[in-house]
Amino acid sequence: MASTVMSLKPAPFSVEKTAVKGLPSLARSSSSFRVQASGVKKLKTDKPYGINGSMSLRDGVDASGRKQKGKGVYQFVDKYGANVDGYSPIYNTDDWSPSGDVYVGGTTGLAIWAVTLVGILAGGALLVFNTSALAQ
């Protein structure tokens, strides 16, 4: 009987990369693209907005049954430099135009706005009419 050598070790598995004509390569190339933040921008508020956000919990525990540590959002005041627990509007009253009672575009701007609105509504009505049974 002839003895054959059998090994229980797995053979190394390798896949050869072959380029197929007509297909783009899916291999990623290294690039030098890098995203970097410009720096920390702190919010400046002259006056606080909203209420102070003090917590008064029943029996001193929150909804999950844990005692409050007293930190809340106040731990981020130094980091963000603003009243983090209050209402912070997008528009500040200091930035508003002093002549805000009058539309800057005038009657010409209002006419252009009205014609644009009527055109959009008429176009939508025309599309609905053309795709309905009434158009037949």
From Swiss-Prot:
Transit peptide: 1-37
Keywords associated with the record: Chloroplast, Membrane, Photosynthesis, Photosystem II, Plastid, Thylakoid, Transit peptide
Highest taxon listed in the record's lineage: Eukaryota
UniProt GO cellular component terms: chloroplast thylakoid membrane; photosystem II oxygen evolving complex
GO term, biological process aspect, one: photosynthesis
Signal sequence extent: none
Record bears the keyword Heme: no
Keyword Plastid: yes
Annotated compartments: Plastid, Chloroplast thylakoid membrane
Classification via PANTHER family: PHOTOSYSTEM II 10 KDA POLYPEPTIDE, CHLOROPLASTIC
Stated family: Belongs to the psbR family.
Function: Associated with the oxygen-evolving complex of photosystem II.
Name this polypeptide is given: Photosystem II 10 kDa polypeptide, chloroplastic
Gene that encodes the chain: PSBR
